[in-house]
């Protein structure tokens, strides 16, 4: 019987750092309609190179959205 292929911890860590992982959490605790605790968290695990690559791409997307919004906005007439 063949044993299933298993990955070492180093291989798993290498893949996570290469691809990146984002955990986004929003939780609210209320008791009798009174909000007691709210937790908002975003945890990102990635290598610096991966983070910089994706940050660059996100900046391009945001810039394109701003440019498109500015072109669509009516210009005030004098």
Swiss-Prot record:
Induction: Synthesizes gas vesicles at all stages of growth in media containing 15-25% NaCl, but not in 13% NaCl. This gene is highly transcribed in all salt levels tested, excpet for very low expression in stationary phase. Longer transcripts able to cover the whole locus are detected at much lower levels. The protein is expressed in both 13% and 20% NaCl (at protein level).
A Pfam family per the record: Gas_vesicle
Alphabetized InterPro entries for the sequence: Gas-vesicle_GvpA-like, Gas_vesicle_GvpA, GvpA, GvpA-like_CS
GO (cellular component) term, any one: vesicle membrane
GO molecular function, one term: structural molecule activity
Compartment list: Gas vesicle shell
Source species, domain of life: Archaea
Claim: Endoplasmic reticulum is one of the keywords in the record: no
Main location group: other
Keywords noted in UniProt: Gas vesicle
Keyword presence, Cytoplasm: no
HAMAP family cross-referenced by the UniProt entry: Gas_vesicle_A
Further comment: In this organism gas vesicles are about 200 nm wide and 430 nm long. The organization of genes in the locus is quite different from Halobacterium and Haloferax, being gvpACNO followed on the same strand by gvpFGH; other genes have not been identifed.
Subunit description: The gas vesicle shell is 2 nm thick and consists of a single layer of this protein. It forms helical ribs nearly perpendicular to the long axis of the vesicle.
Role according to the record: Gas vesicles are hollow, gas filled proteinaceous nanostructures found in some microorganisms. During planktonic growth they allow positioning of the organism at a favorable depth for light or nutrient acquisition. GvpA forms the protein shell.
Similarity remark: Belongs to the gas vesicle GvpA family.
Name this protein carries in UniProt: Gas vesicle protein A
Origin species: Halorubrum vacuolatum (Natronobacterium vacuolatum)
Originating gene: gvpA
């Amino acid at each position: 019987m063949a044993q299933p292929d298993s990955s070492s911890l180093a291989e798993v860590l290498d893949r996570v750092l290469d691809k990146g992982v984002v955990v986004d959490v929003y939780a609210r605790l209320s008791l009798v309609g009174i909000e007691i605790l709210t937790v908002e968290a975003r945890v990102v695990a990635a290598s610096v190179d991966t983070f910089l690559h994706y940050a660059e791409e996100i900046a391009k997307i945001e810039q394109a959205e701003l440019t498109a919004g500015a072109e669509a906005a009516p210009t005030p007439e004098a």
